[in-house]
């Protein structure tokens, strides 16, 4: 192999998958700083990819154990929006295929918005079935947030295009005859729950951005309905909306004044 330019070396390293590759051995002997920097970057990327693979395998253990028992339709369930002062609580139920693989999958709160959006599209493309449950602020006020979250989760399961044989749920138990396991911090421990958390988060964020367009003075597209200083000041200045949860403090206290 003739001596390559730094740019050519970069392209080569994108193709090279193993240190055993003859081209890699030649680049290793290239003493130019630019090439050595690229090799160092290649090693770091390989190390990150290996860590992501190990994390993904660790997060697949619940699903794999159930598949070994002959189950196919395993639904991961998670919610987003229990804490905000405005907007709905949104849940998702996701059934993934056996060969599903998205390295870097994690709890939606730990991912950047760009990564969440990309993973959302990939999950949509690969999933066997996805169901979403949405419960309005009015119903939250009527039955309380805990019951509303349960209801949204049951709705998400009902909206699946297949009947799940088992449920993996993030920190909740559901009144359903379908066998289930409740996993604390499940969105970081199960790929199905993690996928559900991403679907729920992106779905709710998009709804809140639409609310932001409808009520530009409130900044919903920034705080997603949570009780930030900006949001509380907007409520003081412009009033309480129908999208606000009247049973949540401090809105409840504002109404009683």
Curated annotation (Swiss-Prot):
InterPro entries named among the record's database cross-references: RNase_HII, RNase_HII/HIII, RNase_HII/HIII_dom, RNaseH-like_sf, RNaseH_sf
Keyword match Nuclease: yes
Binding site for a divalent metal cation: 78-79, 170
Keywords linked to the UniProt accession: Cytoplasm, Endonuclease, Hydrolase, Manganese, Metal-binding, Nuclease
Catalytic activity, EC: 3.1.26.4
Record GO cellular component, one term: cytoplasm
CDD domains: RNase_HII_bacteria_HII_like
Reactions listed under catalytic activity: Endonucleolytic cleavage to 5'-phosphomonoester
Cofactor: Mn(2+); Mg(2+)
Subcellular locations according to the entry: Cytoplasm
Enzyme class label: hydrolase
GO molecular function: manganese ion binding; RNA binding; RNA-DNA hybrid ribonuclease activity
Residue span, RNase H type-2 domain: 72-257
One Pfam family hit: RNase_HII
Coiled-coil segments on the chain, per record: none
Family recorded in the similarity comment: Belongs to the RNase HII family.
Function: Endonuclease that specifically degrades the RNA of RNA-DNA hybrids.
Protein name as it appears in the record: Ribonuclease HII
């Amino acid at each position: 192999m003739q001596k390559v330019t730094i740019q050519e070396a970069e392209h080569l390293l994108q193709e090279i998958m193993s240190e055993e590759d003859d081209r890699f051995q030649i680049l290793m002997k290239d003493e130019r700083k630019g090439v050595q920097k690229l090799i160092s970057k290649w090693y770091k990327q390989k190390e990150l990819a290996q860590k992501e693979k190990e994390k993904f395998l660790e997060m697949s253990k619940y699903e794999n154990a159930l598949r070994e028992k002959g189950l196919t339709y395993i639904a991961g369930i998670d919610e987003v929006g229990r804490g905000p002062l405005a907007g709905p609580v949104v849940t998702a139920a996701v059934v993934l295929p056996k060969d599903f693989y998205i390295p870097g999958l994690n709890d939606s709160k730990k991912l950047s918005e760009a990564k969440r959006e990309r993973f959302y599209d990939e999950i949509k493309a690969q999933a066997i079935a996805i169901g979403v449950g949405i419960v309005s602020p009015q119903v939250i006020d009527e039955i309380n947030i805990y019951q509303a979250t349960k209801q949204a989760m049951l709705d998400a399961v009902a909206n699946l295009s297949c009947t799940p044989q088992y449920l993996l749920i993030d920190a909740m138990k559901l009144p359903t005859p379908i066998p289930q396991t409740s996993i604390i911090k499940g969105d970081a421990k199960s790929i199905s729950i993690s996928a559900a958390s991403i679907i729920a988060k992106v779905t709710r964020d998009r709804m809140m951005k639409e609310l932001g367009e409808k009520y530009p003075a409130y900044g919903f597209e920034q705080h997603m309905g949570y009780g930030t200083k900006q949001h509380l000041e907007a409520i003081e200045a412009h009033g309480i909306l129908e999208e606000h949860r009247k049973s949540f403090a401090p809105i409840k206290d504002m109404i009683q004044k």
